[in-house]
């Protein structure tokens, strides 16, 4: 990082997580998350009573039980792996300060930025850990960054990396994780790429997320196409985690798994390239819930391929992404 000022920091931002696998902690987290107009666009007078008097009392205990099934000794998997990724990137960016925060929950973005400013940081490269841009995720981080930038005035310069859905090093890292899985377990009958869904109305309103998912899947499949015995036709892209009654991006992951089982498909490998690190949606929804659903529908085995987490290829790819952004900024300074 020769030539870069030591007053520069990298801020990794992930979605967020409850502080504990308990109903009160989950309710606090979901309340903050579901109050974001980027996540739920209903009018506040209609949404807030529904959220606080119906959804949170019902979902709090249910979601807490799901978290309890995947909770790690060090805390929430999402927090543990995000911290590990920040540490791995710090080793690769020794002249910078690498920190991490959550959009919802703790550590809050505002608190981490305040701490960085107290350390003398004057430039912050914000890297939302969402490979694909969406108004429901990345734009919400950008909203907070805009508020923090207004508060900081000229004291801090913010620079956000909006997406990296076809970054060659990231694509190679995901493809490499799939190859490692195949080397240990062999290939399944199908390779399913499962992304978090968004409401179809947002896609209709030109949210780039569906196109980013498709482009990323195609790039990863192309990287795997050189492997002997892999047929790109075995790859399927789906969307998971829908919430509410309105249509979301399709095909749905759960419906696809049931359909594959009905067609006689016995084994499925599932990878989730929309998630930088493992979390509730991968470890519980895919690895436990959807694996059981696939077996109940007649399939034999759903093998979940872990997220990149704090792996060397992941840290290498994101550190290189940061380097390029910093050098591009220095060239135009």
Predicted features along the sequence, with ranges:
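Active-site-proximal alpha-helix that buttresses catalytic centers in soluble enzyme cores
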Residues: 1-333
């Amino acid at each position: 990082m020769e030539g870069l000022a030591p007053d520069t920091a990298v801020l990794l931002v992930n979605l967020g997580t409850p502080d504990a696998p308990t109903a009160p902690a989950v309710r606090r987290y979901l309340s903050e998350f579901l109050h974001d107009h980027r996540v739920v666009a209903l009018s506040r007078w209609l949404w807030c009573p529904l959220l606080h008097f119906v959804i949170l009392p019902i979902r709090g205990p249910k979601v807490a039980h799901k978290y309890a099934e995947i909770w790690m000794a060090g805390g929430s998997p999402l927090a543990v792996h995000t911290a590990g990724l920040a540490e791995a990137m710090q080793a690769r960016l020794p002249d910078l300060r690498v920190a991490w925060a959550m959009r919802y929950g703790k550590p809050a973005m505002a608190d981490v930025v305040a701490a960085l400013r107290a350390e003398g940081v004057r430039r912050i490269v914000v890297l939302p850990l969402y490979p694909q841009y969406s108004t429901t995720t990345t734009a919400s981080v950008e909203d907070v960054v805009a508020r923090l930038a207004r508060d900081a005035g000229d004291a801090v310069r913010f620079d956000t990396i909006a997406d990296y859905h076809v970054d060659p090093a990231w694509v190679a890292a995901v493809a490499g994780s799939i190859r490692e899985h195949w080397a240990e377990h062999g290939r399944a009958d199908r390779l399913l790429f499962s992304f978090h869904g968004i409401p179809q109305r947002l896609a209709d309103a030109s949210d780039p997320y569906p196109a980013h998912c498709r482009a990323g899947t195609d790039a990863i499949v192309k990287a795997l196409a050189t492997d002997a015995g892999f047929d790109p036709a075995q790859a399927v892209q789906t969307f998971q985690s829908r919430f509410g009654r309105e249509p979301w991006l399709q095909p749905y992951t759960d419906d696809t798994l049931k359909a594959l089982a009905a067609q006689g498909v016995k084994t499925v490998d599932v990878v989730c390239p929309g998630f930088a690190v493992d979390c509730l949606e991968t470890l519980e929804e895919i690895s436990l819930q959807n694996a059981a659903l696939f077996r109940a529908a007649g399939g034999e085995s759903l093998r979940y391929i872990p997220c990149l987490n704090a792996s060397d290829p992941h840290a290498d790819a994101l550190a290189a992404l940061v380097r390029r952004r910093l050098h591009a900024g220095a060239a135009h300074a």
